């Protein structure tokens, strides 16, 4: 069990454990527009939806999870939280969910399962299966185009090396970057992740910055502490 300041996350049933990526997106996703409705695509344990329930007054927070174990875990975590009445998890894939869109969302978030090269084995078939498990970015962008409200925002965390590709895809659907934060583990390490926020409205100046997580092992930067202090017990 992973204990945060206002809620806890059980993760015993699922392979999708609480990780830095989810916490980053849940803390970082822009909510300045006071979203009424939020959708979390690929919820895993439900961590991002839970963080957004804490950060906003959104009355409708929907999460989508295709994996049965993860879905059951997310439901359990939602029900145990202080915001159970605002959180709902659908057991469905994105393609199925967008077939009959009923609602528009002011904020759509996704920490998509991506294919990381670190996982390469010598078993080509297994690699291929893993590659197909990754959620195609096209699906996320297409869903956002379909489901975002007029002033809605799409926020994702993806590998830095995929940033240009994702941004180009979003542009095809007339979704434009408004904020980009590039994440490094330590001051000397390479940029690993990109936090990206898109809107239907193009901005003249994109807000771009960099976030370093640790100065040294388990010594967090003031910026990372500031971003996550409402959640982590020891921050």
From Swiss-Prot:
One of its GO terms (cellular component) is cytoplasm. The keyword DNA repair does not apply. Its EC number is 2.1.1.223. It is found in: Cytoplasm. It catalyses: adenosine(37) in tRNA1(Val) + S-adenosyl-L-methionine = N(6)-methyladenosine(37) in tRNA1(Val) + S-adenosyl-L-homocysteine + H(+). It comes from Flavobacterium johnsoniae (strain ATCC 17061 / DSM 2064 / JCM 8514 / BCRC 14874 / CCUG 350202 / NBRC 14942 / NCIMB 11054 / UW101). It is an enzyme of class 2 (transferase). This is tRNA1(Val) (adenine(37)-N6)-methyltransferase. It comes from the Bacteria. HAMAP family: tRNA_methyltr_YfiC (MF_01872). Pfam families: MTS. Belongs to the methyltransferase superfamily. tRNA (adenine-N(6)-)-methyltransferase family. Keywords: Cytoplasm, Methyltransferase, S-adenosyl-L-methionine, Transferase, tRNA processing.
